[in-house]
Amino acid sequence: WRRDCAFHHSISHTGPITVGVLSEGAIGIDVEFENRRIGVSPSLLLRRMFSTEQDAAACLERWSLLQLWTIKEAVLKASGYGLAGGLTNVALNRQRGSAECFGQVYGLTLLRWHQYLITIAAKQNV
């Protein structure tokens, strides 16, 4: 153990699984069961996740609602704000597979393990 070692970490869990990631730079991870029941209407959740209906519709062409949730939560964790940073503050670049939050760009890695959706967001040095 070294106090001058600047590692960043993030963990997430759902049901029986826990995932974690360690990096030398800012990083976030989120996991969700792909068939998870959502306790609110999808339209309400989309309004809380996106500034405009057009942004929501464009992102739903590429990703499922739960994938979008894992992306936004992983980015907010990597930013250091967590969900308090606000889901609408995460802008997705569908062509590049990246996201922007509070002026920082985050690379995205989307994984599927069994029936779980996992997203890792890593801050990019631009």
Would you name each region that the model predicts?
Residues 1-126:
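Core catalytic alpha/beta fold that binds nucleotide/phospho-ligands
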